[in-house]
Amino acid sequence: MTESAGSAVVAGIRDLLPVLRERAQETEDARDVPAESVKAIEETGFFRLLQPTRFGGLEAEPLTFLSAVRLIASACGSTGWVASVLGVHAWQLALFPPTAQEEVWAGDAAVRASSSYAPTGRAEAVAGGHRLTGRWSFSSGCNRATWVLLGAIAAEGEGRPVDFRTFLLPASDYVIDDVWDTVGLRGTGSNDIVVDGAFVPEHRSLSFADVFRCRCPGHEVNTEPLYRLPYGSLFSYSITTPIIGMATGAYDAHVAYQRERVRAAYIGQKAAEDPHGQVRIAEAAGELDLAWLAVERNMTELMELARAGEKIRIPLRLRVRRDQVRGTGQAIRAVDLLFENSGGRALKTGTPIQRFWRDAHAGRVHAINDPERALSAFGRGEFGLEVPPDAML
């Protein structure tokens, strides 16, 4: 991809921000991202950023993708979240066997997939593939997708667990159960996916063991450095970056509000002249800068190694996860500082500060943001101890 193509996508997203900001309450009320918003984002080329060029994609730098995600989330947290998870799935689809990629993209390069990775369903091995049954929750953006990626423990006929796999299913093989009703990220439409005995051919499943080793069937045709990145490094930042964006949106809204605010409780003091408020703003800005600088450092270093054909080793993968969970924490601390400094009017329904605050905290509880798990794994690595599989590297 040329640098100008990625820059054009980011510029297109920047132009969309006023519209996405204006639709933020509508998105929350609908409990789903409006189709018009997804279409507008699609027209910028955003969903093609991580898609292989052989299927009309741009194969952009991960940092370009994450920069666009941060912008979208700074206008509407729910829209940024959905855009990020749908967008990163194009990268994961490129790891599947070539036959699966052809099946998904050959007819329509604009296809999108949602996901739910927790292995809450059952996959039974049958001739030529697996039979999938169960219910999967938290499939963000599923109403704006026509495929889904579902996690399950693949078992032999007698039920013996053999592998944790991701299964790829078309919309005709599942039902969406509209159950999403939450206090945060309300507009993500993260509904349940219900599957009843769908047959999934072997070429539409991907072993997490292969993903962890960065040796996937899709590498046969997608040889570019982008697809050599560790799944845990890119996917984890696709969850943290929207939260950084939400906190950035809260920061922008807060500064604009404080610039004009007069604090009646302090005898008409201008909020902008309050030294205590100034300190909170400085601290919030510092947290956001630290979080984003780590994104830039890690994505740049990962891509440099991938381009050089070098193996991305466990110590770096541990550091990326360490920085990623800390980045989430830094964004949460920033949005908390801003919310606390906003006064009672920020509690009113419809104000952007409270929406960003709720959305950021909702994103924080995603499994990939468990700080103790990631930080403990980093500490174990520093002492040369075995790193547990749940470190999600």
Predicted region positions:
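Basic/polar N-terminal segments that are highly enriched at the extreme N-terminus
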Residues: 1-15, 391-393
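C-terminal helix-coil-helix/basic helical segment that borders enzyme active sites and/or dimer interfaces
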Residues: 21, 25-28, 289-326, 336-347
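Glycine-rich flavin
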Residues: 33-43, 47-145, 160-162
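Buried hydrophobic positions in well-ordered alpha/beta secondary-structure cores of metabolic enzymes
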Residues: 68, 132-134, 195, 247, ...
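DPxDG-like acidic metal-binding loop motif
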Residues: 135-174, 178-179
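Glycine-rich beta->alpha junctions and the first turn(s) of the following alpha-helix
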Residues: 184, 190-288
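Generic structural signal for well-ordered, non-transmembrane alpha-helical segments
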Residues: 245, 282, 286-289, 321, ...
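Glycine-rich phosphate/cofactor-binding loops in nucleotide/flavin-utilizing enzymes
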Residues: 342-393
